[in-house]
């Protein structure tokens, strides 16, 4: 008779509960009530969901990171850099390969053939475009970097790609791959219930479905540069400037969270025998 239930995931010894780090709102009004924000999770329009970010969970990978924000949960693993095949022509720069898979239980629609849908391939292409400018490819000639992303729970495509961008960049840094800077992903939406000058940062699936336009961005806050930008729908230039300014401001806080997670993981590795 089995003494343990194999259907349940047994956490390793020394495991600790998740500690969520709240990202403060960038709103100048400190006495505003969250109950009147109008959002389904009571956040203010310019406030993102609290995130949990933990590097180094996949021991077999060169670098990895798990991220959780609301109903969005995913894990990234980096393998490499490693030499390319002998039959491959010489390339003075490294090659980045990105593969995204959705778990069968990641959304309300069951996926019978994981990895074969166009949603995963589109997300992988977007991740590739967002991360490639941040990697110093010239230092890794004739080599390849394999990045694997598994979506455990999805709360909308744009939220997935934003969280995956941040987690993947942390995984690359944890793998020891030289970067120009950490890449942070963010998304925003223009909702009819809010003025155009108050975009909803980090919208949920429900909020995104009711929005007139959707905006996602990947940027390196340390350098103040944008690596990828995607806009769906129509938005006036004034509102677009507001979205860019708020995303840049919030990304600095998220950059601090990612940096702190890497530092804590490095200190933990140094203490291990």
Give the residues covered by each predicted segment.
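Polyanion-binding surfaces on beta-sheet-dominated domains and ring/shell assemblies
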Residues: 1-273
């Amino acid at each position: 008779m089995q003494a343990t239930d194999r259907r349940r995931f047994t956490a390793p010894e020394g495991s600790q509960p998740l500690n969520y780090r709240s990202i403060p709102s960038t709103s100048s009004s400190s006495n505003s009530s969250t109950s009147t924000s109008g959002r389904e999770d009571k956040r203010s329009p310019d406030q993102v969901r609290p995130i949990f970010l933990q590097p180094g969970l996949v021991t077999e990978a060169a670098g990895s990171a798990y991220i959780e924000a609301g109903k969005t949960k995913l894990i990234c693993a980096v393998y490499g850099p490693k030499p390319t095949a002998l039959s491959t022509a010489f390339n003075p720069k490294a090659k980045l390969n990105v593969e995204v898979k959705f778990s069968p239980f990641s959304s309300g629609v069951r996926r019978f053939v994981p990895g074969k849908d166009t949603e995963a391939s589109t997300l992988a292409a977007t991740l590739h475009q967002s991360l490639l400018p941040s990697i110093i490819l010239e230092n890794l000639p004739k080599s390849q970097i394999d990045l694997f992303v598994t979506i455990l729970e999805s709360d909308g495509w744009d939220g997935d790609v934003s969280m995956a961008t941040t987690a993947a960049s942390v995984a690359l840094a944890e793998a020891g791959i030289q970067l120009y800077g950490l890449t942070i992903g963010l998304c925003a939406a223009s909702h009819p219930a809010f003025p155009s000058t108050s975009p909803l940062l980090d919208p949920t699936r429900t909020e995104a479905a009711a929005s007139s336009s959707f905006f996602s961005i990947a940027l390196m806050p340390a350098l103040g540069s944008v690596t990828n930008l995607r806009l769906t729908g129509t938005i006036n230039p004034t509102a677009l400037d507001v979205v860019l300014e708020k995303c840049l401001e919030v990304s600095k806080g998220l950059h601090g969270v990612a940096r702190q997670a890497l530092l804590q993981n490095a200190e933990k590795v140094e203490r291990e025998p």
